[in-house]
Amino acid sequence: MPDIRIREVGVNELGLLLSWREEVLRCVFSLPENADTSALMQANEAYYKSAVPSGTHIACFAQKDGETIGCGGLCLHDEMPSPDNPSGRCAYLMNIYVREGYRGEGTGKKIVRYLIGCALERNITKIYLETSPCGRTLYESAGFSEMRDMMLLTYGK
């Protein structure tokens, strides 16, 4: 496995965070190059400026030979404590992305393991995510399983 380093990113690298977030959104949502993402990116900027310093979002980059090749994020939040999550602490794994040309080298797995470790260091054991069919194997290999009994309500789609 190549030498891939995962590092946490702060708002001091906001420009890079936003650049990667836009790349992820364009790829995952198949947005055309000419799609206007300015309002969405302003919302992401406000989110990062608030959530990263407050510790409710952990962002990381994967680097190979000093080049950033991937990213990931972890949104931390509370829910009502329950028997399956007595602390009520939760982590939502998101924005896991590796640039084409660097996929298949274990980078995604390293990003996921790093972020799981960040959650566990904070005693958060309820970690969940949404996945695409191409990401399912990665997440299953990290120990994630299908969530049953969940539903989603969306408006305006």
Q: Across the structure, where does each feature detected by a protein language model lie?
A:
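Conserved GNAT acetyl-CoA-binding A-motif
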Residues: 112, 119-131
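Conserved GNAT-fold acetyl-CoA-binding loop/helix
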Residues: 25-47
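Conserved beta-strand in the GNAT
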Residues: 61, 67-76, 92, 97
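Conserved acetyl-CoA-binding loop of GNAT-fold acetyltransferases
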Residues: 140-150
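A short helix-loop-beta-strand connector motif used in the catalytic cores of GNAT acetyltransferases and
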Residues: 46-61, 92
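Conserved acetyl-CoA pyrophosphate-binding loop and the N-cap/start of the following alpha-helix
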Residues: 102, 106-114
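Conserved beta-strand-loop-alpha-helix junction that forms the acyl-donor binding cleft
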Residues: 127-137, 152-156
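Conserved N-terminal entry element of GNAT/NAT acetyltransferase domains
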Residues: 1-15, 157
